[in-house]
Structure formats: C-alpha cells, structure tokens
Amino acid sequence: MRPAGAELVEGREILPGQWQQSWHAPAVVSGARAGQYAHVRSREPGGFPVRRPYPIATADPASGTLTIQVESGSRFGAWLAAHRPGDRVDLLGPLGRPFEVDPRSRHLLLIAEGPGIAGLRLLVDEAIRDGRSVVLLYGAASSAGVYPSSLLPDEVEYVVATADGSLGRAGSVGDLVLEYEAWADQSFACGPPALLARVAALAAGRRGRLGVATLGRKRGGGRPVAAGSPEARRKAFLQVVLGQDVGCAAGTCLGCVVEGAGGPVRVCREGPVFAAAELDWGLE
C-alpha cells in the first residue's frame, strides 16, 4: 500500500481541543470499514517524520472524503489541527482489521468515552445503512466534553453520562451498560483502558448467554473457529478497538504490542479491533 496525498476540505473545533477534519482522499476511502484507521504524515520538508494513526470516523465514497478527530494537546495534534482547507498531508490506509458484525445482529450497543467516539463513528453509519438499531452510550467528564448529538444520525438512540452530572446521567458510561446489554445482539467499545477493562469484565461474566452467541445454536456446538478470525469475532458479544500509537503499521517495529489471551498481539496488524476475549485484561 502506497501513501496517498490528501487535501483538507474542512476543519472545525467540535469540542474544546478536539477538531473534526474532513480530508479528500479517494484512495483511502475506497474499501474503508468501521474500526480501521489512517496513518498521517507531514509532506513538508523537515516536518514530522513519524506517522500517527487516526481512526476513520466517517467515509463517503461518493465524495471521496473521510473525517478524523484530532486532539490538539500533543505537538503532532496541534500541528495537524492548525491545517487549513487546501493544505495537504500524506495518508496511508485503510489499515488494520475492522469490526465484524454478525448478519443476524439487529441491535448494536456502542460504548464510547471521550475521543473514543471516533473509533465507533463509522460503525454508526454502517449499522444505520444496513437497517440495524443503534444505542450509543457516551461518557465525558462534564457537559463541555460531550460529543455533539448534531453529528449523529437521527436514528441513533444517544445516551450520555457525565462524571459531574452536568448532562445526562451522573456517573460513568460503564454504569449504563447493564441497562442495555440484554437488548443488544452485539456490543462495541472504544475508550480509555479502564472503561474497556470494565465492559470486558461484564461481557466475560455473561459469555454465551447474551447476543448472537445465543442464536442458532446446534447440538454439538457446531464446528470450531479460530480465535481472532473474522468468524470468531462475529460471534463475540463484545468487540473493542484499541487506541495505542502505531509506528510502522506493518507489524515489524513491535511498538504497539499488547498482551493477548494467548500471547502478545500487534495492534497494527491483529487489531486495532479485537474480540474482548482475545485480550488479557488481568481479570483473574
């Protein structure tokens, strides 16, 4: 896969320190699926030599544009957020393994906190397009950090929790999961490690008793499927997308390795999407 030039179409601050950017990059948009990411690098002489990964938040094949969500708190993020329409960068993508939705799933539960919404946003569009029902649970510290509902399709049921109670429910977004898990055929999460570990623990305690795992069972259990395969992930109640920094995106630098249930796994190649049971959450 070769890097493609991308031109900024629009950039706007949607939350304090968080920018939504729309890039014209038809070569990257083509074939992009929810959960995948793009690698961004400067085209300027003397610019940042290392690429940074950004989840593909939306992708429109008709216009050839995609959106990413940029936090301006880091040097790279501040540099990228300062771009103006017409500016260009190198994009490499789509990269990584996407979410796998079981064809039988009609009810999808999405769980996000803070910038983690970017890792799930394209899944919202894909699910609505395919006629599925979506509940999005979103958590933030306060109302100032809540993802704007105007950026979501009207068909989505959007439920917010804030730590200070200034908007929606008071508390953590993880507190809301128990209210909706029985409704869901599958669930998908993106956010800080503490949130992912919490929802993974909930899913582990109910494995085989919720969602698509309970559908179409045959005596004898059917044929086994390999852990980490698309088929195995489609049967999982919970999939997560990890937000580790990805250096080479080719699996060679090993800078994004995390501990899996069966040994080390590379976020850039085996992920960034995993079935929750594939990862070692330290729950023993």
Describe each region flagged by the PLM.
Residues M1-P85:
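Ferredoxin-reductase
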Residues E10, T58, V160-T162, V240-L242, ...:
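Structural signal for conserved beta-strand scaffold positions within catalytic alpha/beta enzyme cores
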Residues R43-P45, P94, A261:
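Short, surface-exposed secondary-structure boundary micro-motifs
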Residues G46-Y54, G96-R104, C268:
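Short, Lys/Arg- and Gly-enriched loop/turn segments at beta-strand edges
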Residues R75-G243:
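FNR/FR-type flavoprotein reductase catalytic core
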Residues G119, L242-P272:
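Local cysteine-cluster metal-coordination motifs and their immediate loop/turn environment
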Residues R269-E284:
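Short microdomains enriched in Cys/His and/or Lys/Arg
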